[in-house]
Amino acid sequence: MQQETTDTQEYQLAMESFLKGGGTIAMLNEISSDTLEQLYSLAFNQYQSGKYEDAHKVFQALCVLDHYDSRFFLGLGACRQAMGQYDLAIHSYSYGAIMDIKEPRFPFHAAECLLQKGELAEAESGLFLAQELIADKPEFKELSTRVSSMLEAIKLKKEMEHECVDNP
């Protein structure tokens, strides 16, 4: 019994060391990057087809298999957002933002979720961050336009709420 406990502890320490050293579950199971890409394509296509629950399952598995690929968390967050699971989507986007701090889509989509929850100040903060990350990146021109529109809408909503308080 003592030997089993020692073996289990050694295994846990080895696993922890492997993961902390940049290892992934996919590496442990010898799942190739090609296989991960095929799974990503499957999940992406399911999402694009409106099969959010199916895509969610695949993105969730991908996040477990390779917790370093921020695309997987963007996809997971998008599925959760599409299914109305805003808090879970925000968690996915937050984790992805930690993985890729220069990716403006994470704070943007988190802001969309926050708006759905009626949390204007928090959403505005996320949009400002997205706007800052976009800064003169032509590949995000469309996103930049959306961010600007949403910031303007929040500003107008705040002004209207302020007027209602001042003039009941």
Swiss-Prot record:
Annotated transmembrane regions: none
Pfam families attached to this UniProt entry: TPR_3
The organism's place on the tree of life at top rank: Bacteria
SUPFAM superfamilies: TPR-like
InterPro entries documented for this protein: T3SS_Ca_resp_chp_LcrH/SycD, T3SS_Ca_resp_chp_LcrH/SycD_sub, TPR-3, TPR-like_helical_dom_sf
Keywords, comma-separated and alphabetical: Chaperone, Plasmid
Keyword Heme found: no
Role this protein plays: Mediates the negative regulation of the lcrGVH operon by ATP or calcium. Acts as a modulator of the yop operon expression.
Family: Belongs to the LcrH/SycD chaperone family.
Name of the protein in its database record: Low calcium response locus protein H
